[in-house]
């Protein structure tokens, strides 16, 4: 990592020679085993077509050597006009090689962007918050901000139609033309291989797991670009109150226009002048949060301001990212009568009305008080549907056994069910209605008992009577043990009203697969 940092510092033109260290610098291939780096980058090794070897930069080095030594030809496959990369008369070997190179492109780009991010925060001297990466850290923020706001826009960020759009976004960061052309080439080959293997169910199943890292990197680049423009227009809205920002869509010199922000840089195009009028966007108390492809934009402004932001979002996606977005992807609602799904919770702002009698001397009068409180509950129906897809219960919520786990040992079955139950209980600890969480735990408890009874060819009642109810006690005592550690002095009161207590754990860095946002959108 130090050698890569030295290369970046010595050669300031690394953006124009991005492919050089990947192909010719030996030390790059040691980064795959750098533990300090793996802690900063989420690395998920994947298997390719039954190969036991994982994605490794060292493997890419050997593949590059093969490319130098052998004659990799561009030939047609099955007599079609589409050109594919075929080496040593082995299509699948060539496919494996290209997938490894694509994976290495993503790893190396992550390294460079991580270095740029670290240097940026180092220059800005931003304070480091250890709990900031936690997903649950969003909810205390929503608890503090949303009760004071009026409207919220529920946004589903659209996906670009063509992969070339994602590559074009990288052009503002990377000026290495061979690297970009290579990336386009392998993405084109990926599309061809995908269409070729569509008839082979086993192959397409394994192939669908590939290149997640690259696509995630490209998608994150797209979202980062979108949010960068959003923040810029938000900050400059007061300055651009009477001016058009259509010329900012010329992204090649966008950063230069920011650094030298002068009126002389505005070149008003007649065709774009009406597309991005930034007028009356200086809304007070504007807040934006996002997880994956879903975002929330809340404001204390009026409904008209939110409609203008909606118009700007659609225009930005259409004329800058070159794809059409349906209007239903952005829904504007008043927080007083709207509930939204976000991060596996059904959240809303509750309004409580109360009256206080005030007496001064001989006069008494009533004062009406309105209080707003952020509330989050578990979407039980959707969570039961997720459990049903995972074969823990029926669609109606009736627990069933899991036959695929019946061949495991008793301890493995208990560990798996206990892990899922603790995971859901840990993640949904912020729900204001714990009875719904107890219902989910009850389904998992009976599903575990039915699975064990199925394995031992017995009934659930007979199995529990023989081993005792303490066998599944951990399904109900995990939360009480955590609460007893947090509130040791008031344990009796807390346990008595634990169904109303909400605790946000700040060590959760990913969502449970059963409550992924895509199932709630």
Swiss-Prot record:
Transmembrane segments: none
Subcellular location: Plastid, Chloroplast
Superkingdom of this protein's organism: Eukaryota
Keywords of this entry: Chloroplast, mRNA processing, Plastid, RNA-binding, tRNA processing
GO CC terms: chloroplast
Gene Ontology MF terms in the entry: RNA binding
GO process annotations (BP): mRNA processing; RNA splicing; tRNA processing
Keyword Plastid: yes
Family: Belongs to the intron maturase 2 family. MatK subfamily.
PANTHER family to which the protein is assigned, alphabetical: MATURASE K
Reported function: Usually encoded in the trnK tRNA gene intron. Probably assists in splicing its own and other chloroplast group II introns.
The protein's name in its UniProt record: Maturase K
Lineage of the organism: Eukaryota, Viridiplantae, Streptophyta, Embryophyta, Tracheophyta
Chain's gene name: matK
């Amino acid at each position: 990592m130090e050698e890569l940092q030295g290369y970046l510092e010595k050669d300031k033109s690394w953006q124009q020679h991005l492919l050089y260290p990947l192909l010719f610098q030996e030390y790059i291939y040691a980064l795959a085993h750098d533990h300090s780096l793996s802690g900063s980058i989420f690395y998920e090794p994947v298997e390719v077509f039954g190969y036991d070897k994982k994605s490794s930069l060292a493997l890419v080095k050997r593949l590059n050597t093969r490319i130098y030594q052998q004659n990799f030809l561009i030939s047609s496959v099955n007599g079609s006009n589409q050109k594919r990369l075929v080496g040593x008369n082995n299509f699948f070997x060539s496919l494996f090689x290209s997938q490894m190179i694509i994976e290495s492109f993503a790893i190396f780009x992550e390294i460079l962007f991580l270095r740029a991010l670290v240097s940026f925060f180092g220059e800005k001297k931003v304070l480091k918050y250890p709990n900031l990466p936690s997903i649950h850290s969003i909810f205390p923020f929503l608890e503090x901000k949303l009760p004071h706001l009026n409207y919220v826009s529920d946004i589903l960020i659209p996906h670009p139609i063509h992969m070339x759009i994602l590559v074009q976004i990288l052009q503002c960061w990377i000026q290495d033309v061979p690297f970009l052309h290579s990336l386009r080439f392998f993405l084109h080959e990926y599309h061809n291989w995908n269409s070729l293997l569509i008839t082979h169910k086993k192959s397409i199943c394994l192939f669908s797991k590939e290149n997640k890292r690259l696509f995630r990197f490209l998608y994150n680049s797209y979202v980062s670009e979108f949010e960068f423009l959003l923040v810029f227009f938000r900050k400059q809205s007061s300055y651009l109150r009477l001016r058009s920002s259509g010329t900012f869509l010329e992204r090649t010199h966008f950063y230069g226009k920011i650094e030298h922000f002068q009126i002389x840089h505005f070149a008003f195009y007649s065709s774009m002048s009406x597309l991005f009028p930034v007028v009356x966007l200086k809304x007070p108390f504007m807040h934006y949060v996002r997880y994956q492809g879903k975002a929330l934009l809340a404001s204390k402004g009026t409904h008209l301001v939110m409609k203008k932001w909606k118009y700007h979002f659609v225009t930005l996606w259409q004329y800058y990212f070159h794809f059409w977005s349906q209007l239903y992807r952005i829904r504007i609602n008043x927080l007083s009568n709207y509930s939204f799904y976000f991060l596996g919770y059904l959240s809303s702002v509750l309004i409580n009305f109360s009256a206080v009698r005030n007496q001064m001397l001989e006069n008494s009068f009533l004062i009406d008080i309105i209080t707003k409180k952020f509330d989050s509950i578990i979407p039980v129906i959707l969570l039961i549907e997720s459990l049903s897809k995972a074969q823990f219960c029926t669609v109606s919520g009736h627990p069933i056994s899991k036959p695929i786990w019946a061949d495991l040992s008793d301890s493995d079955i208990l560990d798996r069910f206990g892990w899922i139950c603790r995971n859901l209980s840990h993640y949904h600890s912020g729900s204001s209605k714990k009875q719904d969480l107890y219902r989910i735990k009850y389904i998992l408890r009976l599903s575990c008992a039915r699975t064990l009874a199925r394995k031992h060819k017995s009934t659930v009642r007979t199995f529990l009577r023989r081993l005792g109810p303490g066998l599944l006690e951990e399904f109900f005592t995990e939360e009480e043990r955590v609460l007893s550690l947090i509130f040791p002095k008031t344990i009796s009161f807390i346990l008595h009203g634990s169904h109303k207590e909400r605790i946000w754990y700040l060590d959760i860095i990913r969502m449970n697969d059963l409550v992924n946002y895509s199932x709630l959108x």
